[in-house]
From Swiss-Prot:
Pfam families: Ribosomal_S11 (PF00411). One of its GO terms (cellular component) is ribonucleoprotein complex. One of its GO terms (biological process) is translation. This is Small ribosomal subunit protein uS11c. Residues 9-22 have a biased composition (Basic residues). InterPro entries: Ribosomal_uS11 (IPR001971), Ribosomal_uS11_bac-type (IPR019981), Ribosomal_uS11_CS (IPR018102), Ribosomal_uS11_sf (IPR036967). It comes from the Eukaryota. Residues 1-22 are annotated as: Disordered. The keyword Chloroplast applies. HAMAP family: Ribosomal_uS11 (MF_01310). It is found in: Plastid, Chloroplast. GO terms for molecular function: rRNA binding; structural constituent of ribosome.
Length: 138
């Protein structure tokens, strides 16, 4: 009969607080990915390491409400709340995607009190690359 393998605690149960100590981050990059279905906000330091993130889905919105401007605004507020506590004062903003949450997310970032060094649209545009999918007939 084989020996029973001791169960290693799962990731969900193993961590109560933050893994790393709260480090001071004076400058960072805020990435906003706004699709038609959801808005994802990721805050990184200048080297690209993720400090905080949030999305409309994790902010409590479900279904089609995740794509709304108000959901994007709430997601930005949740993501930025933690980095302001860590001392972030200046940030660059990278906005990607065609969604409704683009402008609302940018407005929420401006209202948060973080000084924006620049705002860049990094939406991927094909230079006539792959053939797009056929149009829907509803």
């Amino acid at each position: 009969m084989a020996k029973a393998i001791p169960k290693i605690s799962s990731r969900r149960n193993g961590r109560i607080g933050s893994r790393k100590g709260a480090r001071r981050i004076p400058k960072g990059v805020i990435h906003v990915q706004a699709s038609f279905n959801n808005t994802i906000v990721t805050v990184t330091d200048v080297r690209g390491r993720v400090v905080s993130w949030s999305s409309a889905g994790t902010s409590g919105f479900k279904g089609t409400r995740r794509g709304t401007p108000f959901a994007a605004q709430t997601a930005v507020a949740n993501a930025i709340r933690t980095v302001v506590d860590q001392g972030m004062q200046r940030a660059e903003v990278m906005i990607k995607g065609p969604g409704l949450g683009r402008d609302a997310a940018l407005r929420a970032i401006r209202r948060s009190g973080i000084l924006l060094t620049f705002v860049r649209d990094v939406t991927p545009m094909p230079h006539n690359g792959c053939r797009p999918p056929k149009k829907r007939r509803v």
